[in-house]
Amino acid sequence: MRNSYYVSEEELKKQREIMEEIAWENRGKEVYYHIETYGCQMNVHDSEKLAGMLEEMGYKYTEDLEKADVLLFNTCAVREHAEVRVLGRVSQIKELKNRNPNLIIGISGCMMQEKHIVEAIREKYPHVDIVFGTHNIYKFPELLWQALNSRVQVIDVIENTQNVIEGLPIRRDSNLKAWVNIIYGCNNFCTYCIVPYTRGREKSRRPEDIIAEVKELAEKGYKEITLLGQNVNSYGKDLGGDINFAKLLYMLNDIKGIERIRFMTSHPKDISDELIYAMRDLDKVCEHLHLPVQAGSNKILKRMNRRYTREHYLEIIDKVRANIPDIAITTDIIVGFPGETEEDFFQTLDLVERVRFDGAYTFMYSKRAGTPAASMPDQVDDEVKKDRLIRLIELQNKISLEKSAELKGKVVEVLIEGVSKRDPNKLTSRTRTNKVVHFIGDESLIGKLANVKITETKAWTMQGELVEVLR
């Protein structure tokens, strides 16, 4: 039985019929699309779904914007900088529309769940044809049909977040690695974060739907999957019964053909012993954990509403490493959160020193309208934020270099992903700990697992020599 928040078969049938109608209209024509994606892996996967629908409708992908008949921007709202970039880009595209009045321009994603952004587009960007959000991607064929036939701006942003969609066509960016959504939305409401407002509350996919998708990927030759969610550790809580994220990993580990399983992102407050033991015991689950800490000060963590302490986070790290000694741990850190003093920042630096992360995504706090942190007192000056970010990056780069140097001379297993973009004579591959290794090899090895000896190391990329092909 479907959960109540699944999109109905009748609605999906309607969209499929519209796709067929547009494909019929496009028969015998050379029509093209281009998608620009901003933000997280969830957005990347949403863009794969949009691309899949466009190709079902007869469009072909192009990098040449002058050639495009449909141009989509899939947007991110996590930081103000991303919004500024998108709106600047949309302004630039007006000239393209002037040269090609038949071009359909669409904007989707998290930014479109912000009312003030939608109003700005309505008032200042009349050259944009379609506006839709994160909850009704499945309606894109209908919105495109309206835009093609009415030539008036189509805005369809819904507040209803209870929409999980199965069965949409997907044009994946790789034929080797695949993103697989397992849970949408977030219930955590960190005070700085806009995601619960743009992506909605947590909604888990049914395990049978996830298993069916991964089995299909295995049959098509995919070797690696990355399970996606704002908080994968919450998977299954809304489904009832005896399913959780650790149990899902056990189910997926049994699927033949899949060689590697990754996942992101995990919330520290929801890391369980059961999950740690699953990561330890399941041979396909890679030794890499992305565990955002955000700050090293208990005062700041409380203001962020992260619902764990510095001490609890360090306990998790100790337990993970005790069970999985060779694991790579990465994180997210925000500097300059409202109320952060120099002492608070020193506590963050101290935590980074103690944990010795393999890598970190570091950011200056960005005020997001509508979040509690935006109206907090003691906002930190931008120059102070920049100074702290530089110091944090310098420390983390030093640690990342030292961690990578420990691998020099060792033989590691890699999945060979393709030809190096910098050197056509080399292949690019990835270790189980998610580090990139380049080495000389033939293109026929792409898609294979191999052992490579590390000969040179940098912070997150390495050079190596092929030792043996495994399978």
UniProtKB/Swiss-Prot annotation:
EC class name: transferase
InterPro entries named in the record: Elp3/MiaA/NifB-like_rSAM, Methylthiotransferase, Methylthiotransferase_CS, Methylthiotransferase_N, Methylthiotransferase_N_sf, MiaB_methiolase, rSAM, rSAM_horseshoe
Stored SMART domains: Elp3
Radical SAM core domain: residues covered: 172-402
All residue ranges annotated as the MTTase N-terminal domain in the record: 31-149
Stored Pfam families: Radical_SAM, TRAM, UPF0004
Entry-linked SUPFAM superfamilies: Radical SAM enzymes
Keyword terms: 4Fe-4S, Cytoplasm, Iron, Iron-sulfur, Metal-binding, S-adenosyl-L-methionine, Transferase, tRNA processing
Entry's Gene Ontology molecular function annotations: 4 iron, 4 sulfur cluster binding; metal ion binding; N6-isopentenyladenosine methylthiotransferase activity
Binding sites annotated in the UniProt record for [4Fe-4S] cluster 1: C40, C76, C110
One CC-aspect GO term: cytosol
Enzyme nomenclature, EC number: 2.8.4.3
Positions of [4Fe-4S] cluster 2 binding: C186, C190, C193
CDD domains in the record: Radical_SAM
PROSITE patterns: MTTASE_N (PS51449), MTTASE_RADICAL (PS01278), RADICAL_SAM (PS51918), TRAM (PS50926)
Cofactor note: Binds 2 [4Fe-4S] clusters. One cluster is coordinated with 3 cysteines and an exchangeable S-adenosyl-L-methionine.
Localization annotation: Cytoplasm
Reported cofactor(s): [4Fe-4S] cluster
Residue ranges constituting the TRAM domain according to the UniProt record: 405-468
Annotated catalysed reactions: N(6)-dimethylallyladenosine(37) in tRNA + (sulfur carrier)-SH + AH2 + 2 S-adenosyl-L-methionine = 2-methylsulfanyl-N(6)-dimethylallyladenosine(37) in tRNA + (sulfur carrier)-H + 5'-deoxyadenosine + L-methionine + A + S-adenosyl-L-homocysteine + 2 H(+)
Family to which this protein belongs: Belongs to the methylthiotransferase family. MiaB subfamily.
Listed NCBIfam families: miaB-methiolase, MiaB/RimO family radical SAM methylthiotransferase
Quaternary structure (record): Monomer.
Function: Catalyzes the methylthiolation of N6-(dimethylallyl)adenosine (i(6)A), leading to the formation of 2-methylthio-N6-(dimethylallyl)adenosine (ms(2)i(6)A) at position 37 in tRNAs that read codons beginning with uridine.
Listed name of the protein: tRNA-2-methylthio-N(6)-dimethylallyladenosine synthase
Originating organism: Caldanaerobacter subterraneus subsp. tengcongensis (strain DSM 15242 / JCM 11007 / NBRC 100824 / MB4)
